[in-house]
Amino acid sequence: MVRNSVPSWFVVLLTVAMSIVCASGDEGLHVVTSTTDLASLVQKIGGNRVAVTSLSRGYQDPHFVPVNARSLLNLNRADLFLVIGLQMELAWLGEGLSELSPIAQCRNPRIQSGSLGYFDVSPYVQVVERPDEITRAQGIHPLGNSHYWLDPDNGRRMAQAITTKLSALRPNDAAYFEQQFALFSQRLANMERLWDKKIEPYHGYKVVTYHRAWGNFLKRFRLVSVGEIEPLPGIPPNDTHTSALIREMKRQKVRVILVEPCYEFKNPERIATDTGARVLVVPGSVGGVGKATDYFSLLEYDIESLVTVFQLLSGGHHR
């Protein structure tokens, strides 16, 4: 179900906007993404050959993003539209051929599902927590954990897929895109070595998260999730689940709770008070905090935040 609807007057506005766009001339490849993380990767690869717009902001819940007239104008203008997939955007973009979907309402044949300008990145990455059976028993993660970009290995895979897609749309710029990818990949490899060195003393440390967003990240950096504050992805906390989680945190001596900026803090703080744990606010997307300005600084911020709190809790002694 699509939660957003667009007023009928928008048709008039869109018609006017289309005429303006057509008269503006070629300004390079216009790319729209569902998330800021995709936008950052597109910018790294596309460089000055693309203009990139994200429909969401990094401090928003990427599962539930308001769609407005500006969103549809951006979609109408796009040569390429990228999505995270795995039903991440289902609640606000819909799927298939639904007439209520903003993708259908934007009246841009270039980016309709199945066209060259519609690109779901999820088939190109490693997805964790894939269920044996696809049901809503997995909450809003019915196809597995859709926050896969938080693993830098997947960041590289995403960038490679974006390189191939941009090259298909702009063959004359293919060499440029490949060069940009090589620079991105080398920089990411250098930073991964630094991140691995920083986090290595804390392999096996246990955390609780608000939302099941960190599966790929925790697996990549060898940390352990004991549970989530949400009973299922996207389902609000309840007393029964919270009480069980508190008991388990005490039993396993979990002292860190990861919370993204888009979530409420009342429940995490209550749990922290009852368990002696610390609430650590970590962005799950580019722009989630001011210092997370691109893909590299997002992961840098998250790693540094975790290392700092682990150091404090361990008294500087590694186990």
Spell out what each predicted region is.
Residues 1-10:
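Bacterial N-terminal signal peptides that target proteins for export
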Residues 9-19:
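Bacterial N-terminal signal peptides
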Residues 24-319:
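Extracytoplasmic metal-acquisition and chelation regions
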